[in-house]
A protein has these predicted regions:
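Internal transmembrane alpha-helices of multipass membrane proteins
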Residues: 1-60, 123, 132, 137, ...
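Juxtamembrane helix-boundary/capping and inter-helix hinge elements in multi-pass membrane proteins
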Residues: 39-45, 73-74, 116-126, 151
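Alpha-helical membrane-protein architecture signal
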Residues: 4, 93-96, 126
Length: 171
C-alpha cells in the first residue's frame, strides 16, 4: 500500500488533468487508509475511519468545485484560462469547495481532527510518510490553487487571502 500511495502522489504532482488528479487523490486516500488501519486494533480502525471519512468527504467537495468551473474542460490550464467566464459567486463556491478538499489532507484547521488520531495509530514506518509527504500534498494543492486562481485578484484581496492563511500555518 505504501508504493501505491507514493505512485498516486507522483501522479498527482505531474498531471494537468483534473480527472487524473481526482482519481489519484482517491487512490492516495484509500491506500493510506489501509496503512493507518494496518495494526488492526480498535484504535487504528477508529483513526483510519475518521481519516477516510473526513478526507473523502472533503475530496468529494473538491471534485464538485472543479466540476463547477470545469465545464467541458479537463485540463487544469484550460480551466484556469476560462475562469473569467464564470460569475463571482460560482468562483467563490468553487474555490471554497476545492480548498476544503486540499485543506483536509493538509490538516489545516478546522479539518485537522484526523491528524492526532492517525499518526499514533499508524505504524512508525507509515507515520513518517504520512506527516512528511501526504499532508504536504494538501499544501501543494492549496499553493497551486492560490497561485493560479487568485493571481488576478486586486492586490488588497490577494493580501487578505494570504494573511488569512498565515495563522493556520502557525497553529
Amino acid at each position: 500500500f505504501l508504493l501505491l500511495t507514493f505512485g498516486a502522489l507522483l501522479n498527482i504532482v505531474t498531471t494537468d488533468n483534473i480527472g487524473t488528479l481526482a482519481s489519484q487523490w482517491e487512490v492516495m486516500t484509500w491506500a493510506s487508509f489501509a496503512l493507518v488501519a494496518w495494526e488492526r486494533t480498535s484504535k487504528a480502525r477508529d483513526a483510519a475511519i475518521k481519516y477516510v471519512v473526513l478526507c473523502c468527504s472533503a475530496a468529494y467537495l473538491m471534485i464538485v468545485g472543479f466540476f463547477m468551473i470545469g465545464g467541458n474542460h479537463t485540463q487544469y490550464g484550460e480551466i484556469v484560462a476560462n475562469l473569467s467566464v464564470h460569475s463571482d459567486d460560482v468562483l467563490k463556491f468553487a474555490l471554497v469547495f476545492t480548498l476544503l478538499g486540499f485543506a483536509a489532507k493538509a490538516g489545516l484547521v478546522p479539518l485537522h481532527s484526523w491528524l492526532p488520531d492517525a499518526h499514533p495509530a499508524a505504524p512508525s514506518s507509515v507515520s513518517a510518510p504520512l506527516s512528511g509527504v501526504l499532508t504536504k500534498m494538501g499544501v501543494f494543492g492549496v499553493v497551486t490553487l492560490c497561485n493560479s486562481w487568485l493571481e488576478d485578484l486586486p492586490d488588497y484581496q490577494n493580501a487578505d487571502a494570504y494573511n488569512t492563511a498565515q495563522p493556520t500555518m502557525v497553529y
